[in-house]
Amino acid sequence: MSKAIILNNELQKNGEVALPERFKEIHSHNLYLYVKSYLASLRANSAKAKKRGEVSGGGKKPWSQKGGGRARAGSITSPVFVGGGVSHGPSNNRNYDLKVNKKQKKLALQYALMEKAEQGKLYVVDSLQVDSGKTKDAYAMFKTLNERSTLFVSQISDEKTFLAFRNLKECYLADANELNAYLVAAFRSVVIEKSLFENITKEG
């Protein structure tokens, strides 16, 4: 059974909580589809080559059809000419987005969390709030955890807490709206607030 580690306010181990058995039935393909869709949405789609209809010039036939001994040509915009259009080149009007429905997104997140739990890298804490807003306090929290590359997930975005975590290189603070399967998979460990963890693991 996959279990998340419960932490107290000092981020010391204080017990375990089991993930629902239904998480075991989720197929890894849901995570694959979501990550593929997420990365596709980040593509800049800036590669562009002009086709023969977009190259300037070419209104005049470059030489006579017959009598010159050269191959016939109708326009200097032809791909066979230097400076002509490009055949089958990249076009910036392509849409790389891949559709993933809400159910698949949810299953992908649940599967990613289950994987972290099986690795012993999923932690549940009552609150991640840093009232001081100071980076040193957020760093102390991270150092106590003794993990590399950690995703902290809070239920509600708090400005002071965000500022406290913002400058830490190996940490990232996400709220409930930002949390997704890609973020969970990208970090080595995940610390999530109890209220949000319960929302994700409940039925329905």
Swiss-Prot record:
Role, per record: One of the primary rRNA binding proteins, this protein initially binds near the 5'-end of the 23S rRNA. It is important during the early stages of 50S assembly. It makes multiple contacts with different domains of the 23S rRNA in the assembled 50S subunit and ribosome. Forms part of the polypeptide exit tunnel.
A GO CC annotation given for this chain: ribonucleoprotein complex
Subunit structure: Part of the 50S ribosomal subunit.
Entry protein name: Large ribosomal subunit protein uL4
Biased composition (Gly residues): 55-71
Ribonucleoprotein as UniProt keyword: yes
SUPFAM superfamilies attached to this UniProt entry: Ribosomal protein L4
Biological process annotations from GO: translation
